[in-house]
C-alpha cells in the first residue's frame, strides 16, 4: 500500500513531538495524542507530500486482541 504523507521540516517534526508530549503530560494516552496531532497536521498542512510504502501484511492482524513481545531473552522454566 502506498500513502501520501505530509512532508515536514525538522522544526515541524519537533513541534509535533513537543505537542504530543504536552498532551501526554495532561493525561492523554500516547496513541490518542499521536492520532490527534497527526489529524491536526493533515488538516493544516499546506506543503508537499511524500509517498510512503506500507507492507500490507502489517495490516492483516490489526484486529488481533493478543500481542506478543520478544525481547530476545529465553524464558525461564517454571
From Swiss-Prot:
List the Pfam families hit by this protein, alphabetically: UPF0181
Compositional bias, Acidic residues, is annotated for 54-78
**Residue ranges of region Disordered?**
49-78
Q: Which InterPro entries match?
A: UPF0181
What's the family? Belongs to the UPF0181 family.
Task: List the HAMAP family.
Answer: UPF0181 (MF_00507)
Q: What is this protein called?
A: UPF0181 protein ECA2377
Taxonomic source organism: Pectobacterium atrosepticum (strain SCRI 1043 / ATCC BAA-672)
Q: Tell me the classification of the organism that encodes this protein.
A: Bacteria, Pseudomonadati, Pseudomonadota, Gammaproteobacteria, Enterobacterales
